[in-house]
Amino acid sequence: MKMPLTWGSWFLLSAWILNAGAEISITPEPAQPAEGDNVTLVVHGLSGELLAYNWYAGPSISLTFLVASYIVSTGDETPGPAHTGREAVRPDGSLDIHGALPGHTGTYILQTLNRQFQTEVGYGHMQVYEILAPPTVMANDTALVERRDTLRLICSSPSPAEVRWFFNGDALPVAVRLGLSPDGRMLTRHGVRREEAGAYQCEVWNPVSVSRSEPLNLTVYFGPERVAILQDSTTRTGCTIKVDFNTSLTLWCVSRSCPEPEYVWAFNGKALKNGQDHLNISSMSADHEGTYTCIAKNSKTLLSGSASVVVKLSAAAVAMMIVPVPTKPMEGQDVTLTVQGYPKDLLVYAWYRGPASEPNRLLSQLPSGNWIAGPAHTGREVGFANCSLLVQKLNLTDAGRYTLKTVTLQGKTDTLEVELQVA
């Protein structure tokens, strides 16, 4: 009486009867399946009339790794301990895996039994590739100081995959790739450079899937460098800037710096109340002659730099002259009769309404620096150390000729006239 063949009985038989001439091979279709694909482990090289198949998912023939046993004559399939609920054996011995998962990756063994109760064994390997989720770029810091700080970027992904890096949308430059770890997941740059500031991304990939991270933006602080003072926001630079009397001048402080530096201006060594990148002189006079210095300070790098320039009246402005400011004053306004090129060794001066005679004297300045009112003073005139005369709240009767008389320490006397018009 023949005993029926069961998976348990033939598993025991197969453990000791082996046909040494086995040439069975196993290949997956598709060859590089993605997770979720239906995969068939196709068997090649089967010979003779076969009674049964055993499929194993593991490195050896062991009950622990048994996926399923299949009886050819009846079509009965019995799942084993390693069956995941997705496997099915075909009559030709191939194994279908429905919706394969990365966990199905590994070695597969097919064991066959023929009518002589001999077994043959075939081996194959299958790699199920994940559909990769976007990785994340993590940094030790996203704002670093040039040549001082170290940059460390990590491409974080839960999946085993190849890694590529991108910088500002392009493949990472060769020089930067030198800082990659062997697995490509960590990028290290000692003494980071300004040209390495930008957007970094990493991309994970396998034969069936590619996924790129969101960009991580890196800022590299540097400077200030090449601090310079420009005239009127142009490229005109130099140690000395010559300006015509009563004209305007704008000095611009420029530098190469990230972030934009803080600015401090000084005039002849004395700090000015100006925190801007430019300094305006609205009406050039002898009082504005001197050395202007701009100091640029970077709060991130803790570095600073400075530049200086000498501002002088132009040669054409050296001769003494009087210019009303504003040039066309209106009734009710104040006007300053500004003196250009007044003597540096001035002893005294006097202003007159009309010709230089005592009854017409408005005011005069004494060697002490104080000024005293003259017979023609109306109470609206004020004198300054630079010889200028302020006339307040003009009326139409203030129009006419004004005369300035100066005396130097050497006794040189000069007289200068100006015609004031009041609109």
Swiss-Prot record:
Principal location: secreted
UniProt record, GO biological process: sensory perception of sound
Occurrences of domain Ig-like C2-type (ranges): 134-219, 224-310
Annotated S-S bridges: C155-C202, C253-C294
Record-linked InterPro entries: CEA_cell_adhesion, Ig-like_dom, Ig-like_dom_sf, Ig-like_fold, Ig_sub, Ig_sub2, Ig_V-set
Keywords: Disulfide bond, Glycoprotein, Immunoglobulin domain, Repeat, Secreted, Signal
Highest taxon of source: Eukaryota
Gene Ontology MF term list: identical protein binding
Residue positions with a glycan: N38, N217
Entry function: Required for proper hearing, plays a role in maintaining the integrity of the tectorial membrane.
Protein name (Swiss-Prot/TrEMBL): Cell adhesion molecule CEACAM16
Gene for this chain: Ceacam16
